[in-house]
């Protein structure tokens, strides 16, 4: 039986659905690797050198298409265990997400392919103002994985993380 994280609850009327995000930190006792994501639709673009990423065993950058068919970028960092992901990876994760994210060389804790953790911020009328902004506004720690997810804000990013992990759970239950 699949433990699907994409849950919906009825709101004020039967036609309204409310998104319920997954827990930010969860451990099902599994040890994941990049091979577990082959059937999810995730396409690996780069494998990062993790020599300077304390405790990480591997890290990857890639994309998955959303429900509209548009590619969205994700970063996956793997650790030996869930405890390592939490205890060694959290400070690196917090450093690059959200409103206080550090996406410049002078303050980022891990510089490997830093440019892939940024995007140009949009201005009025969908014009680009050329200001660098963090690509990932949230992350989840799922078993031994830290998953960084794109989004316009923390809630949008968490929804993308939940959908991503839900696809993993669905593919592993088949």
What are these model-predicted stretches?
Residues 13-66, 158-174:
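N-terminal "mature-domain start" segment
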Residues 1-10:
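Sec-dependent bacterial lipoprotein signal peptides
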Residues 20, 109-174:
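A short, solvent-exposed beta-edge/loop patch
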